[in-house]
Amino acid sequence: MNATLNSAGGKRQLRFRGDVTGSRVEELHHQQQEEQKQKAPLAQDDVAATPTATPAAGSAQQRLQSGTAETCTNTFYDFFKVEMTRGYMLEHDEERYSARRQKIYSFMRIPRDLERFMVYGIMQCADSFLYIHTFLPVRFVMAVWALVSRTVARIFRLRSSGQRLLSPAEICDLLKGVIWMTVTLIMLLVDTNRVYHIIKSQSIIKLYIFYNMLEVGDRLLSAFGQDTIDALFWTATEPKNSKREHFGVLTHVLFTLIYVFLHSGLIMFQATCLNVAVNSNNKGLLTIMISNNFVELKGSVFKKFDKNNLFQLTCSDVRERFHLSVLLFIVVIQTMKEFDWSITQFCVMLPDCFAVLFTEILIDWVKHAFITRFNELPESIYREYTTSLAYDMTQTRQKHAFSDHSDLVARRMGFIPFPLAVVLIKAIYTAVSFENLAAWLLFLLAYLFAMGLRICLTICALGKACKLMKEHQTERNSSTPSSMTNVPVIGAAAPVSAAATGGQNHNNNNNNNNNSISIGSKPAQVTTLLTPPSAGHLDVSKNFSRTSIASTSTPKKAVSEQELDVTNSLELGATALFSNSDVDLDDVCLNEQVTNTNTSSAVQEVYQEQDLVRSQPDLMLLNNSGDGVTSAKAKKATQRLPKRTHKRSESEPGMPSMVEKGGAAGIAGGNQTTQL
């Protein structure tokens, strides 16, 4: 009976032999004995070859055994001591830890850069909002006066019938004033006190759901409203000779009135809900409304954002913050009117208003900090956003702008001032009585204060815009030379006459046409000169060719037109940073005039970019160097090919030439020459 046992990592065969007197176990190490017999001659040869190996091996074995014995004798105290005294070498991963530290610093700087953009965006929103209350009534009165006076002049034939009664700007001002006053008069018929008590009688859950529905509706109407207003303005000011495909001006006026009325009613319900939450004895509704911002944080942080998406989100946050500030101002007016303008009630409700506004600001900080952290966006991106708003500001301050500033702000941030202005006028009209002269004097002072504030905001915003544009253009001017590293910089060389320059150009072109580089076993070495040689000592062997601008691909221009104003050429429009659809990649080329602003205007010369050495012979050129029939076929095939819109890569061969070359005789590779 045989069995197998594992002992000391080896296998032993045990045979049990039975006899008459009892049993005896014999251990038979067959495999071990055979292995020892096989290894014995080899070990003797090794010992004879290296007699000093045995003592060294013995000492190593002794050290191993002693180390094993020491390891076996380690205690828990030794383990605890090693864990308590273990060292750290952080400098071995210095780059990773430095990057982590910079990310933390960038995370902490995000609120500062975000608030700079927020302040500038709120300035533009306030400028557009105050325009409705200050300058629009004056422009509306001027438009009405122009309409009446010009109509009377046409009746008495003091004005020709071919002239338009109103300019496009006057038509837009007239329509804005009519819409604003009509919706305001309709909203004054709504009883705000009854709406307040109806909302207050509802449960907290119903009010929470209703407030969320109002927020969603506000965003949807803001996205839809500006298109309605733009359609009305274009329909009213469209030229008569153009093809009219619309419903008519009255239909668009009706659409716009319905939109402004619905949006104004929605904002009125928002202000009433916020008023109930602030003035209620149970602060549960206010707490739920504040906690609603954290739901927005959850829905925004864990999404992927790029520069354009983050810009839209940031502009939406600017609009929401300004919108919330105006709503809180309306709530304060309504509450103070109910408590007879008591300063005690103002001090009671002020902390709640600050809590709502501070929560909105804090959520914006955390949201943008984590969005930039997760999407690897730098904090300097908010400066680019501010620069884009600066270009919007300057574009609408021209004498004949394409649109009103409020319209452009609405398109950029989704802020439409008309509904919010209607609700504010309703709140002020119901809170203040105009029964005596003092009230009208206070109203006049308030109007003058609002106009002065709007003028100050315009001056500050426009000055900030000019400063940002100047800094942006300076950065672009400083970065323009670095983007043209392949073009050698022409230094202040010795003056050369036009005749000498023309002679040198002719000689250089002839020399370059006669020279060729033979491609052998070793590739040619290309040397790039950072500083070009002077005009009088130009080395032809460097393979530089000099040609005038008239021989380049750019069209010829007069000498007066060749002067370039770098500052004016780098000015961008409203969508300068984010409008990639305006660039045609097929027409992109290097503007030689940028590099020649310091040269003479008579004959301007540049160094052409040095050709690259190909990794293999030019198959098109080799095909042309063959017999005449094959070359003619290749030319015809090349002419039939469609025009390429992009460059072929250096290692990409010409496929038609390879097909035509298949029937021709082989060409020796060692004697081929390619002209660069």
UniProtKB/Swiss-Prot annotation:
Compositional bias annotation for Basic and acidic residues: 24-38
GO annotation, biological process: positive regulation of cilium assembly
Keyword flag ATP-binding: no
Pfam assignment, any one: DUF747
Chain residue ranges for the region called Disordered: 1-44, 625-676
Family, per entry: Belongs to the TAPT1 family.
High-level lineage: Eukaryota, Metazoa, Ecdysozoa, Arthropoda, Hexapoda
Main location: membrane
Alphabetic keyword roster: Membrane, Transmembrane, Transmembrane helix
Biased composition, class Basic residues, residue ranges: 633-647
Protein name: Protein TAPT1 homolog
Signal peptide (from-to): none
Annotated TM spans: 128-148, 170-190, 249-269, 346-366, 414-434, 437-457
Cell location: Membrane
Membrane topology, from the record: Multi-pass membrane protein
